[in-house]
From Swiss-Prot:
Changing H696A: No effect on catalytic activity. GO terms for cellular component: cytoskeleton; cytosol; Golgi apparatus; mitochondrion; nucleus; trans-Golgi network. The gene is PREPL. It comes from Homo sapiens (Human). Serine peptidase whose precise substrate specificity remains unclear. Does not cleave peptides after a arginine or lysine residue. Regulates trans-Golgi network morphology and sorting by regulating the membrane binding of the AP-1 complex. May play a role in the regulation of synaptic vesicle exocytosis. It comes from the Eukaryota. Keywords: Acetylation, Congenital myasthenic syndrome, Cytoplasm, Cytoskeleton, Disease variant, Golgi apparatus, Hydrolase, Nucleus, Protease, Serine protease. This is Prolyl endopeptidase-like.
């Protein structure tokens, strides 16, 4: 099941349908695009995202996000007021951006939506959906199936492909860079392929074949940014399109996926704490679905299938962490579940994959990555500790029962291929050029003791030959929400910073998911301040152990990570010199008080219900960044916001910026002459949205800001980036 499991595990912690074998299988909350699974470096106008079979692994699924957009024209006066002109020495960064934009694509790690089915590979080439014979996939000998420009969209790209079992049809989900709306097109495959149908606002979708060899497409539909309806459709001479299921509870969302063996189509109904799964027989898709287990509050579960048995990843029982259970497919209810495999305490289940004779679990324990290979014939377990430099998995979809391929990466190291071969019982790594970063940098796993004594893990990177680390600049990363891990995928600009002498620190605070479900529970609702205490402890510990100093320390956060970063700026502004925030969630109270937003109900499990619970309201007031702005000294802050962001209210970011500038002005007035006012920059990107790809302009602007605020020479940055581009 591979990336689908990863999707599921993240979906359990945040609301809307996120990460997996394809964008639709992701489940995102209001304020986080998690991750899109992997870092995608956009070089031209097309998104190229690479997978290996008929279950592509890419980014997000249901965009069940409330639209809170404001026109660029309306915001222009505010933008002009809050933005400061770029410094004259911006030339070096302009060169960097120009170099990035003109660099040939082949010099980058490109990820492309690519699906193998039968003897063909289906993928995007330019602005077309194409296919080629498997052995010819690396050349230009391909067949054009559909031109995306027929949809008359601005810069369209494919983020998911599904091929019908007998290859009579292919379905592709298409969206644009500037919008989260998507269209699913159905292409009839023949000597002259033709678009037979298109459906708007499709989230997840899967093909099955019925008893009469007719292809049936099941798909979920979003209405008012909520994914509650399941449809099934047929094509050709027997066309029909009917609603199959509707979820009535607005706090739940629905998504679909096939078990890896394609035996069952699963309908997954879930919110942050509870799930329910129905099975549709892949051989009899018109039969009524079968319920696995009726939803029980607090019980989460995910289902896979092999040899007439269901394998269920669930948190039922004690401890309330994920464990693997098993039952016969014809007796699926919870009373029949037998414990099959248990994880150690404080272990995060990252992914799970089923093979003919093996089950493979990808885990994180003590801030290190492991692979556990379970022999299904004899219940044997082989645990492999992965290289200590690795911080993230990238799963390859794979139908080969003999091998389990995957990639490992870190923020400063591009993905490297590994394959576990079941017959040999060994892990093999890709041979070839060894990345020089392995010798020129160090990765450290440290811990900080929080206010209540809890040990908080940190991952730290720096150059091997760095001397006097106390005088080096430090960039601290934080997230701490929705049970999601802090993103540690490869980022070229992070590598550039390390090459230029920076220290990178990733603080895995409570509220995230690095140590399992309990780690998340200890940092949400009325325990949110634990995450803030953890962040403060991490920064103080780093300084205490000789890593940088407050005047050279910077902090960065994205989306919901802005809550803790913004709270730190209010509570301990002296710890950092500068902060960069991207699409930050900064006004928790007013957003959660607005019950007219379609997804507020889904967010209550994370932030609480301030509208009806006075305890929740008062607690949110204690840490909400917007509510706690006061006249005092603040670090300089660079905020990147997107005009068409459908997850974080742009109006709230503008209000936060205005209130912050007023507080700083009042403090400056009280302090008198000689006070150095911090720079507060609001960069509103027109035409973007919460899931927009990293643009070179944005990256260089953020790097420029950090260097300027710390008074550092930026000359070497361009040289380091040129070295990276030759990779």
């Amino acid at each position: 099941m591979q990336q689908k499991t990863k999707l599921f595990l993240q979906a359990l912690k945040y609301s809307i349908p996120h990460l997996g074998k394809c964008m639709q299988k992701q489940h995102l909350n209001h304020y986080n695009f998690a991750d899109h699974c992997y870092n995608r470096i956009k070089l031209k106008k097309y998104h190229l995202t690479k997978c290996l079979q008929n279950k592509p692994k890419i980014s997000e699924l249901a965009r069940n996000i409330p639209s809170r957009s404001f026109s660029c024209k309306d915001l222009q006066p505010v933008k002009q007021e809050n933005e400061k002109p770029l410094p004259e020495n911006m030339d070096a960064f302009e060169k960097v951006r120009t170099k990035l934009e003109t660099q040939p694509q082949e010099e980058y790690e490109i990820i492309n939506v690519e699906v193998k089915h039968g003897g063909f590979v289906y993928y995007q080439e330019g602005c077309c959906l194409v296919r080629s014979k498997d052995e010819e996939a690396d050349n230009d000998n391909y067949e054009v199936l559909f031109n995306l420009e027929e949809l008359k969209l601005d810069q369209p790209f494919i983020d998911c492909i599904r091929v019908a079992p007998d290859e009579k049809y292919v379905a592709a989900k298409i969206r644009t860079e500037d919008s989260e709306a998507s269209t699913c097109v159905i292409i009839k495959l023949s000597d002259q392929p033709v678009m037979e149908a298109s459906f708007p606002n499709v989230s997840s979708f899967e093909w099955v074949k019925d008893e009469e060899d007719e292809d049936v497409l099941f798909y979920t539909f979003q209405r008012n940014l909520r994914c509650h309806d399941v449809y099934r459709a047929t094509f050709g001479d027997n066309k029909r399109n009917e609603r199959f299921y509707t979820e009535k509870d607005p706090s739940y969302f629905v998504f679909l996926y096939l078990t890896k063996d394609s035996r069952f189509l699963t309908i997954n109904i879930m919110n942050k704490t509870t799930s329910e799964v129905w099975l549709i027989d892949g051989l009899s898709p018109w039969d009524p679905p079968v319920l696995i287990q009726k939803r029980i509050h607090g019980v989460l579960y995910y289902v896979e299938h092999r040899d007439d048995e269901l394998y269920i990843l669930t948190n039922v029982g004690e401890p309330t962490e994920f464990k693997l259970m098993r039952t016969a497919a014809d007796t699926p209810a919870i009373m029949n579940w037998d414990l099959f495999f248990t994880m150690k305490r404080n272990t995060k289940v990252i992914d799970l994959d089923m093979f003919k004779d093996h089950c493979v679990l990808f885990l994180k324990h003590s801030n290190l990555l492991y692979v556990n290979v379970i022999g299904l014939a004899d219940d044997s377990v082989r645990s492999l500790k992965l290289p200590p430099w690795a911080c993230g998995f990238i799963m390859d979809t794979n139908s080969d029962p003999k091998n389990c391929p995957f990639q490992l990466c870190s923020p400063i190291r591009p993905p490297k291929y590994y394959t576990y071969k079941f017959a040999e019982g060994k892990l093999f790594e890709e041979t070839g050029h060894e990345d020089p970063i392995t010798k020129t940098s160090r990765v450290l796993r440290l811990e900080a003791k929080s206010k209540d004594g809890k040990l908080v893990p940190m991952t730290v990177f720096h150059k091997t030959d760095s001397e006097d680390l106390q005088k080096k600049p430090l960039l601290v990363h934080v997230y701490g929400a929705y049970g999601m891990d802090l993103k540690m995928n490869f980022r070229p600009e992070r590598r550039v910073l390390v090459d230029d002498g920076w220290i990178l620190a990733y603080c895995h605070v409570r509220g995230g998911g690095e140590l399992g479900l309990q780690w998340h529970a200890d940092g949400r609702l009325t325990k949110k301040l634990n995450g803030l205490a953890d962040l403060e402890a991490c920064i103080k510990t780093l300084h205490g152990q000789g890593f940088s100093q407050p005047s050279l320390t910077t902090l960065t956060a994205f989306s919901a990570g802005g809550v803790l970063a913004g709270a730190l700026c209010n509570s301990n502004p002296e710890l950092v010199r500068a902060v960069t925030l991207e699409a930050p969630f900064l006004d928790v109270l007013n957003t959660m008080m607005d019950t007219t937003l379609p997804l507020t109900l889904e967010e209550l499990e994370e932030w609480g219900n301030p509208s009806s619970d006075e305890k929740h309201k008062n607690y949110i007031k204690r840490y909400c960044p917007y509510q706690n702005i006061k006249p005092q000294h603040y670090p300089s802050i660079h905020i990147t916001a997107y005009e068409n962001d459908e997850r974080v209210p742009l109006k709230g970011i503008v209000s936060y910026t205005e209130k912050l500038k007023e507080a700083i002005a009042e403090h400056a007035k009280d302090t008198g002459e000689g006070y150095q006012t911090p720079n507060i920059i609001l960069d509103i990107q027109p035409g973007g949205n919460h899931v927009i790809e990293d643009s070179h302009k944005k990256i260089t602007a953020q790097i420029k800001f950090l260097y300027e605020e710390l008074g550092l020479d930026s000359t070497s940055v361009f040289e380091d980036l040129k070295k990276y581009l030759k990779f």
